[in-house]
Amino acid sequence: MISVATLECFTHGKIGIKIHKMACGYKELQNDFGYDIIRGNVLVTASMFLPSKESIESLLNMKLPKSDHEFKYSKAYNEENDLKVAEYISKALKEKLKCNIAISTTAGVGKGAISILTDKNSYLFTSDIYGNLIKGENILKRQENAVNKAFEAFIKILNEEYNIKE
């Protein structure tokens, strides 16, 4: 079994929850893309929604860079720093939970960032949608795009790195 952990911000835990539901065999999803690849091959050890910088630092025993923007209780970086922070988080998550695959997401101003760290490789990419957390622009469109893009990348990784086919 391939173990997966997610620590998500702008995707609100939706990536991990989707993987978990498929891994558990939810019948409502049995016709969805990726179901047969995940079911019986993947287990989710943790799926977290953590917008708070302090909570992430405390849980993963790490220090994140200062936010680029002030935004209520949440961290908010520009796209360049989102990419760095997503990668930091996935590395710390993988180390802390000893999982095969760690997925993290974070987005402030820009397209956001998705990091998928496997036993062999590191994948770092953005959504296709510009959003601005501070101004509330395109937040849900960016989120939906990122969830879909990350899930598709996850399935491709299972195919190519772990040789799991439908």
Swiss-Prot record:
Record-annotated disulphide pairs: none
The record ties this protein, via Pfam families, to: HcgF
> Which domain of life, per UniProt?
Archaea
In terms of NCBIfam families, this protein maps to: PRK00962.1
Q: Which HAMAP family match?
A: UPF0254
Q: Name the family the entry cites.
A: Belongs to the UPF0254 family.
Instruction: Give the protein name, as stated in the record.
Output: UPF0254 protein Mevan_0254
Q: Which organism is this entry from?
A: Methanococcus vannielii (strain ATCC 35089 / DSM 1224 / JCM 13029 / OCM 148 / SB)
Query: Mind giving the lineage of the organism this protein is from?
Result: Archaea, Methanobacteriati, Methanobacteriota, Methanomada group, Methanococci
